[in-house]
């Protein structure tokens, strides 16, 4: 187990219930969204850090070209959803913690209602509508058909490579209709056989939702397509780790598909861990897929913590 998981409420209890002389652990993703890495640092302080440049120099990992692919779609529906989301969020002072507590904690809900001169019933109704709007907006972003279209375009241009896709849902992964899909609905033996067969292949496509984000070593992967963006640097590092296994002469490619001018841009900004090349048109994407150089541009991101939602 990578040690970043030891900061959870369940696993962190082991620090006080297990007798040990010293702890030695390793992770590529110490930082957590909830800030609980301080627990790990307390019991197992960081004694050494290996930089990416050091790993590349020692040929422990392969270089990766990171592409941010901006998808331009009709945002009429998104703007309507975003307007609803913001109207409900304003009721909770644009504070995620307040909104979630109002939804889940009746004592907090009663207290907050009293503070703002409302009723617990009204506060709960606003919180429920806020959550509904949040999920609707996220669904628009995550499951937009443009992502499937562009994903297929990339896969069709890399038929001679071993590719992996990171999808928001199993249903989304299956709708790509390229290669094979791993998911919890299949028997463990079926998923294992699929990975074994893929390891022995020279090219192909492996689709998954979260099953392959971490803890899996798959041979020969050199192309990744990420379509399940959130604000977590852990997820970004783990998915990149799937394709950067060292092989002589290999340069891997990671394509991150993002709906332009939406909250997904901010999620990408919060989760990004490396330099990237911006692809803001299908013409530029075609050039990249033909191994041509393109001119990239810079984007100013707002990486405020509250923008992770």
Question: Where are each of the predicted segments found?
Answer:
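Conserved Walker B
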Residues: 1-4, 211-212, 228-230, 243
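Post-DEXD/H (motif II) to motif III coupling segment of the RecA-like Helicase ATP-binding lobe
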Residues: 4-66
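Catalytic P-loop NTPase motifs of RecA-like helicase/translocase cores
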Residues: 5-7, 32-33, 215, 233, ...
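Short, Asp-centered acidic motifs that coordinate Mg2+ and/or phosphate
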Residues: 22, 204-205, 223
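Conserved interdomain linker/interface between the two RecA-like ATPase lobes of SF2 helicase motors
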Residues: 46-161
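Long, largely alpha-helical accessory region at the distal end of helicase-like NTP-driven motors
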Residues: 104-108, 113-115, 277-309
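Conserved helicase ATPase core of P-loop NTP-dependent helicases/translocases
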Residues: 162-166, 171-216, 235
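Conserved segment of the helicase C-terminal RecA-like domain
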Residues: 242-272
């Amino acid at each position: 187990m990578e040690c970043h998981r030891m900061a959870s409420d369940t696993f962190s209890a082991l620090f006080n219930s297990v007798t040990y002389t010293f702890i030695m652990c390793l992770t590529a993703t110490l930082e957590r969204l909830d800030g609980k890495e301080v627990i790990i640092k307390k019991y197992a302080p960081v004694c050494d850090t290996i930089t990416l440049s050091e790993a590349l120099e020692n040929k422990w990992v392969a270089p990766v070209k990171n592409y941010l692919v901006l998808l331009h779609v009709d945002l009429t529906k998104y703007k309507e959803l975003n307007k609803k989301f913001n109207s409900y969020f304003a009721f909770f002072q644009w504070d995620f913690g307040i909104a979630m507590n109002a939804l889940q904690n009746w004592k907090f809900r009663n207290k907050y209602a009293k503070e703002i001169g409302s009723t617990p019933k009204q506060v709960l109704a606003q919180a429920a509508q806020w959550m509904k709007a949040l999920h609707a907006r996220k669904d628009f972003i995550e499951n937009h058909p443009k992502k499937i279209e562009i994903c297929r375009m990339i896969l069709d241009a890399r038929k001679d490579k071993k590719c992996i896709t990171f999808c928001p849902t199993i249903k989304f992964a299956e709708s790509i209709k390229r290669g094979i899909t791993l998911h919890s609905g299949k028997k463990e033996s079926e998923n294992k056989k699929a990975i074994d067969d893929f390891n022995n292949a020279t090219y192909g496509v492996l689709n998954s939702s979260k099953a392959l984000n971490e803890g899996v070593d798959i041979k020969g992967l050199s192309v990744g397509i990420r379509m399940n963006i959130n604000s977590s640097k852990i997820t970004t590092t783990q998915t990149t780790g799937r394709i950067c296994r060292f092989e002589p002469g290999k340069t891997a490619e990671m394509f991150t598909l993002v709906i332009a001018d939406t909250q997904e841009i901010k999620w990408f900004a919060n989760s990004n861990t490396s330099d990237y090349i911006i692809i803001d048109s299908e013409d530029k994407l075609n050039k990249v897929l033909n191994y041509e150089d393109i001119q990239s541009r810079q984007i100013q991101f707002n990486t405020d913590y509250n923008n992770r939602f």
